[in-house]
Structure formats: C-alpha cells, structure tokens
C-alpha cells in the first residue's frame, strides 16, 4: 500500500518573492516552496532580465502542498492577506509588471476556485479600489537563482520593501 501523499502545486505572484515565499513556508501542509519566474516569453530568464521588465515574467512562488493537510482555498485566503491586490504592477515601492498580483492556475478546478475567491474578496468591502489580480494558466516555471531561494529564512529574517 502506497502511503505517499498526492502533492499538488499552486503558483502565486504578490510582489517580491522573498516575502511571498516566507509566508507560504509557514503554512502547515506546504511541503516545499520555490522562488522563480512565470508568465513571460523568454526561456531561462535571469533576475536582472526579469527586473529589466523586458521579459514579461512575474516574480512568483511555486507552492508544493499536500491537499489532505491544506486546501487550495486556504492557500488562496493566505494569498489575499499577504499583499495589496489593488495595486497594479507593483507592491509598495517595488514597481513593475514583474511585481504584479497574479494567480497562475494548474488545473480547471484551481481556475474556478481562484475566480470565485477573487469575486468574494472583491465584494468583501476590505478594499477601497478594485482588485487588479491577474488569473492566468500556469506556463513554464523558471527557478530563480539559488540566492533567492528561502532568502529571508537564510538571512535570519528581515523583509522586502512592502
């Protein structure tokens, strides 16, 4: 009998990936996180290229999770709380499409859940401006350079600009 859990992936962009990754790493049921880039047109982009805003990529975090321990809906709830989804192509002082608010879905079920979640958030009264989060199909995920992986954890805390 195979006891290995069936793991799933979720991918979120919510500004600087250092902060986003640190938040999701705290969640029980999250097995792994990876900082990287998605949503652009250049293969194997570097951090410098993504920051140039000429590759179309967003800084994202790929979240590998056990759905028996944490639901995708719970990950979405966390996503909405860790950034301001009303800021277009920025989070705080970090400006550019690479810092956009985006949910990349991996399955039709994730797409439906993301859209319902965004509709619920939009009607929650929490925001004075409309939500501008993009919801898009997951494309190639490119790992960020090693020094970006678990960046805040490795450096004993700190934060991004947001």
Swiss-Prot record:
GO cellular component: cytoplasm
Superkingdom as given in the UniProt entry: Bacteria
Catalytic activity: L-methionyl-[protein] + [thioredoxin]-disulfide + H2O = L-methionyl-(S)-S-oxide-[protein] + [thioredoxin]-dithiol; [thioredoxin]-disulfide + L-methionine + H2O = L-methionine (S)-S-oxide + [thioredoxin]-dithiol
EC number: 1.8.4.11
Active-site feature positions: 16
Keyword match Amino-acid biosynthesis: no
A GO BP annotation: cellular response to oxidative stress
GO MF annotation terms: L-methionine-(S)-S-oxide reductase activity; peptide-methionine (S)-S-oxide reductase activity
A family per Pfam: PMSR
Record keywords: Oxidoreductase
Described function: Has an important function as a repair enzyme for proteins that have been inactivated by oxidation. Catalyzes the reversible oxidation-reduction of methionine sulfoxide in proteins to methionine.
Family as reported in the entry's similarity comment: Belongs to the MsrA Met sulfoxide reductase family.
HAMAP family found in the cross-reference section: MsrA
This protein's name: Peptide methionine sulfoxide reductase MsrA
Organism of origin: Geobacter metallireducens (strain ATCC 53774 / DSM 7210 / GS-15)
């Amino acid at each position: 009998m195979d006891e290995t859990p069936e793991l799933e992936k979720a991918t979120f962009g919510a500004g600087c990936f250092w902060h986003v990754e640190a938040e999701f790493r705290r969640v029980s049921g999250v097995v792994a996180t990876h900082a990287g880039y998605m949503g652009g047109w250049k293969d194997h982009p570097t951090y410098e290229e993504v920051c140039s805003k000429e590759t179309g990529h967003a800084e994202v975090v790929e979240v590998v999770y056990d759905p028996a321990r944490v639901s995708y809906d719970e990950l979405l709830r966390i996503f909405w709380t860790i950034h301001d989804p009303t800021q277009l192509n920025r989070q705080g002082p970090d400006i550019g499409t690479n810092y956009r608010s985006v949910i990349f879905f991996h399955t039709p079920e994730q797409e439906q859940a993301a859209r319902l979640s965004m509709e619920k958030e939009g009607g929650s009264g929490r925001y004075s401006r409309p939500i501008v989060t993009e919801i898009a199909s997951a494309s190639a995920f490119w790992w960020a350079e090693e020094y970006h992986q678990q960046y805040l954890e490795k450096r004993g805390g700190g934060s991004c600009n947001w």
